[in-house]
Amino acid sequence: KTVFSWSMYDFANQPFTTLIVTFIFSAYYTQAIAPDIHNGTFLWSIGIAITALFVAFISPLMGALADQGGYRKILLIFWSWICILSTIFLFFTYEGQIYIALFWFVIANIGFEMGSVFCNAYLPHIAPKDKIGRISGYGWSLGYVGGLIALMISLFLFVQPHKPIFNLKKNSSINNIPV
């Protein structure tokens, strides 16, 4: 039960990277929010780099806190909420808001990455030493399943419908994602 619960974090969390970082919002940012695809791709890359640098510098400190044990759960929840709330703000960005959208993306991506630090810190405590690799792979595979399900739902309900879902106008940000 504990291993399944731990794995479900990946199932629920992986759609962020699938939808926001890789397929849907990244395309929307580079092709609709940014003035052109070249500037959009450049700025998106800058956002990824900022996230990577921040995570590289702060992860050792956060990892030490996670290893202490007492902060693991509260910081997992904290960083997860940072990701969730920042991702919600992405919904409200539209054409021309290149820096606002990039700001919320970077904050959300940092929240995602730092949440992963604390999720991963649980693994040695829930898995026997000889099964850590197998259990880690189980979580990883459930993450991919979650990401694929979220991608299919997004494509069929939001990106490619002939009639917009939830009565959203066809040119609203959620239905204006180029694929």
Question: Each predicted region: which residue ranges?
Answer:
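Cytoplasmic membrane-interface "Motif A"-like loop-to-helix N-cap segments
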Residues: 66-82
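Hydrophobic core of transmembrane alpha-helices in multi-pass small-molecule transporters
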Residues: 80-118, 122
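Loop-to-transmembrane helix entry/capping segments in MFS-fold secondary transporters
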Residues: 38-42, 129-140
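Glycine-rich segments within core transmembrane alpha-helices of 12-TM secondary carriers
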Residues: 113, 133-159
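Helix-loop boundary and gating motifs at the non-cytosolic
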Residues: 1-52, 98-102
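Central cavity-lining transmembrane alpha-helices of secondary-active solute carriers
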Residues: 20, 24, 41-65, 85-86, ...
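Helix-to-coil boundary motifs at intracellular loop junctions of multi-pass secondary transporters
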Residues: 32, 68-69, 122-126
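Transmembrane alpha-helix termini and helix-breaking/packing motifs in multi-pass membrane transporters
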Residues: 22-33, 147-179
